[in-house]
Amino acid sequence: MTSRLVRATSLTIAIMACQSEIGRSQVKLASWLDEPKPASWNKPGLPIPAAPRIQGNVDPRCRDLARPPQLEEDNRLRDQGWDLVGAYQGGWQILVIRGTASYDGMCRPRQYQDFVFVRGVFAGTLSPQAMDSRTDGALGRVSLQSNNRLTAEYERYFATDPLCCPSRKTSVVFDIANDASVLRPVSASTSSNK
């Protein structure tokens, strides 16, 4: 009985220690969203980033759900190793296309990114690093506002939030420079989901 209690206690302590580390790493990744005017990571003329290398194999059932390329921009993303996820958004000669490098066990995107193209030119990404579904800073909805503005909403988790239910969201307004096709964040605001 005592050895069972010791094992159960040790396991509980290990799980709690890992949970706090996971929460800390999520906060570090999404900290750019805490700035009222985030610094821009997009620069004119940058190439489309390659998909991150993933350890292990991707479940072929998830990969079968990827959208086939339809546009030249889709092909450019595929050439960099990205699977296309969901429908692209377009208007005002702007395209927003989501790509992922991998999937979780429920075929949700892991190591994904949203790419913005303006008049066929790569203008940048909607996050400074690839994101994982159901983690702090995961990109949700993107709304095209005009020919030079879009808004993106990011899920925000506290370490105590269940994975199903982020307690906050951060909306970031992005402008597209007219002189050079480059996407820049101009403001960020966080609100409660309650």
Identify the residue ranges that each predicted region occupies.
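Bacterial N-terminal signal peptides
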Residues: 9-17
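Bacterial N-terminal signal peptides that target proteins for export
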Residues: 1-9
